[in-house]
Amino acid sequence: MLETLEEARKELIRVDHLVYVSLKYTRTVDMIKHAIKRIISSYDLLNEALLLYSKENKKILEIPSTPVSKRETLMELFKEDEFILKNVMLHTWLRKVDKIEKYKASREFRKHVTMTLELEGKEMKVDIEKIYEYYNLLQGYNDYVKKIIIGEKEEE
């Protein structure tokens, strides 16, 4: 569980570099896609850590193997926790965005580079500001999950 948290921290460092260095200077939709993949990877690790924590505390018997069942388990375990639910839903939405192959790039190599795609019948725009927003939510989620897991360890 602590190893998974450490992996998540390292992945968060990679996301930080992507967002504040690579994306800032490259300004392409490919970099937006890459940042989304890294954010998803970080969420995967943090959610895995929460599931390991739940298993260790005997709230679940085993950790689900598929992303959908992991999401459902987390939503059931933490149904009272709005912050976790919000982040689990964002993670799910980002996974859907990542799977979309057809998107339009506009204003590449400029400040307002935008990836436009259609998701569930709606046109969605993802730009650098949105990536910053997702990254900030991810940082908050990382701190929150760490507090849940490590905070419990310190109390014992």
Where are the predicted features?
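Generic recognition of short, well-ordered alpha-helical interface segments
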Residues: 3, 10, 37, 41, ...
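Long, charged low-complexity segments
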Residues: 57-140
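Amphipathic, well-ordered alpha-helical segments in soluble domains
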Residues: 11-18, 38, 45, 137, ...
